[in-house]
């Protein structure tokens, strides 16, 4: 699977897993969260005797009835210093274990570059790890990693890169030097480049073998058009000329430079030692040759349209969505949209989509919603599920109906409380290690967030009410405008796709 297909598959899996796709059986059927549970302990029509004792909760109701004091958590605050060239470094001491974490994050990626750099930018994170350094060929880097128990992490998206290294304190000299070499002096070994290119070519040719990933990729392409968010890796992107060491080095110079970077160090190292090492390695790092041009905002498709990809498969993938309208920031609509999304489909088995599609109707193992937001522009609000071909139209209508229900009727207090508690209490897992705390601060700086963003976010989420959820759903979510994309065997659908809206067939 290609880099973009893999990332989309990961997104798809994350959405589905977040919606509770864990068990194979259906188990006991819990009540829908927006409805009173039916009383199955007495015959129909029989009323409980006056003054009868209330029945104690059983099964899942016992767990849902549990209440805990609200979690109060204050993360340690990293220190911050600058190198002689202005590069910011975050530092957090932690001597509880003989470990040191080194982190570099960069603003940049294929979203900032022309299409002919798409493959080079996509390959960058992988080749920083596998492509060697100017001092060491790839196999020598592998030997160092194994001999000194170094743990190297690389990651990328359309707009960010990360290169992190974890090492035992006693191996810090070796680990730090290798980390700095990977950042400043990558080799981009031609054989490793060709290996990456060959794998991506095969993945691009086989993308249709993965219907779930195909649905997400094609949906993004439909919604975002010729915007980086909608790009799909194609063989024409993967020519040797577009992935040469020279092109990789030129792309590296554009992105991996001080004005795009933030560094971090945490663990068993003093601040003075961290300053010395960082200044020696990065204090004279040459400035960026040019300023990266900010990506243009996407023009997201509006208006009902049904897109169908015919595949001879027993299960359909359904994706629905529209422009989400909400921007990430310290505002009521953003916080209310977080709670609304959790209730709609982000809260696992407690979410309405899972309740309706799985528990009530038995149409799917799971379903999930997403409500994207960025500081610069709106993203997508929508949902995704898989269902058997013969229930495709019914499942699609049920998703849209659940959304319509949420935009016309406020959620219950208990739904909002559960969503709020889940988000707030889950926040602690964003700070399970000093490295995570430092990395969070680095990301906030790259995104120009206020330093107290975390506390603002928690306060904003805690202030959400059922009324504000109803308001944000009513103003920003309209199922009648949703774009629908279905991958499946149309001949086995429980109706024609045209009953949902005007149909366009896609041929990837």
Tell me the role of every PLM-derived stretch.
Residues 21-71, 262-264, 385, 418-508:
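C-terminal regions of mature proteins
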Residues 57-81, 221-261, 293-298, 324-328, ...:
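Histidine-acidic residue clusters that define the catalytic metal-binding segment
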Residues 103-166, 231-233, 347-365, 375:
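M16/MPP (pitrilysin/insulinase) zinc-metallopeptidase core fold and M16-derived inactive scaffolds
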Residues 199-218, 297-316, 355-364, 409-460:
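Short acidic/His-enriched helical or mixed secondary-structure segments at domain edges of catalytic enzymes
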Residues 212, 216-217, 221, 245-281, ...:
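Non-catalytic, conformational "gating/processing" segments within enzyme and secreted inhibitor domains
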């Amino acid at each position: 699977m290609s880099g973009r297909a893999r990332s989309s598959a990961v997104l798809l899996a994350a959405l589905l897993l977040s919606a509770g796709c864990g068990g194979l059986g259906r188990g006991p059927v819990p009540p829908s969260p927006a409805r009173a549970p039916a009383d199955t302990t007495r015959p129909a029509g029989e009323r409980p005797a006056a003054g009868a004792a209330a029945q104690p909760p059983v099964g899942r109701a016992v767990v849902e009835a549990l209440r805990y004091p609200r979690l109060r958590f204050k993360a340690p605050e990293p220190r911050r210093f600058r190198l002689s060239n202005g590069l910011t470094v975050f530092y957090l001491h932690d001597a509880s274990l003989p470990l040191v974490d080194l982190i570099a994050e960069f603003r940049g990626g294929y979203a900032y570059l022309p299409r002919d750099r798409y493959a080079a930018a996509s390959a960058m994170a992988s080749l920083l790890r596998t492509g060697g350094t100017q001092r060491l060929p790839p196999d020598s880097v592998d030997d160092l990693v194994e001999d000194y128990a170094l743990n190297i992490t690389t990651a990328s998206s359309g707009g960010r890169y990360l290169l992190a290294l974890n090492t035992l304190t006693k191996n810090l000299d070796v680990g730090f030097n290798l980390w700095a070499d990977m950042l400043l002096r990558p080799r981009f070994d031609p054989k490793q480049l060709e290996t990456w290119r060959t794998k991506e070519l095969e993945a691009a040719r086989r993308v249709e073998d993965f219907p779930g990933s195909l649905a997400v990729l094609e949906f993004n392409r439909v919604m975002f058009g010729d915007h980086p968010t909608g790009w799909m890796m194609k063989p024409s992107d993967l020519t040797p000329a577009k992935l040469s060491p020279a092109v990789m080095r030129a792309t590296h110079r554009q992105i991996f430079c001080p004005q795009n970077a933030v560094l971090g160090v945490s663990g068993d190292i003093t601040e003075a030692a961290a300053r010395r090492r960082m200044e020696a390695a990065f204090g004279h790092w040459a400035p960026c040759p040019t300023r990266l041009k900010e990506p243009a905002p996407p023009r997201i498709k509006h208006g009902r349209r049904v897109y169908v990809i015919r595949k001879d498969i027993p299960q359909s993938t359904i994706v629905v969505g529209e422009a989400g309208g909400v921007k990430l920031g310290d505002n009521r609509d953003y916080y209310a949209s977080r709670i609304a999304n959790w209730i709609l489909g982000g809260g696992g088995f407690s979410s309405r989509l899972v309740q309706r599609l799985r528990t009530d109707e038995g149409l799917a193992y799971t379903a999930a919603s997403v409500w994207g937001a960025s500081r610069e522009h709106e993203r997508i609000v929508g949902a995704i599920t898989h269902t058997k071909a013969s229930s495709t139209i019914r499942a699609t209508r049920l998703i849209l109906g659940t959304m319509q229900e949420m935009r016309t009727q406020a959620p219950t207090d208990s739904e909002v409380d559960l969503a709020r508690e889940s988000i707030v209490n889950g926040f602690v897992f964003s700070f399970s290690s000093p490295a995570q705390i430092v990395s969070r601060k680095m990301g906030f700086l790259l995104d120009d967030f206020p330093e107290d963003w975390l506390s603002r976010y928690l306060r904003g989420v805690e202030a959400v009410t059922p009324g504000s959820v109803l308001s944000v759903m009513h103003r920003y979510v309209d199922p009648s405008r949703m774009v629908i994309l279905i991958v499946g065997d149309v001949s086995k659908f429980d109706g024609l796709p045209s009953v949902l809206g005007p149909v366009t067939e896609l041929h990837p």
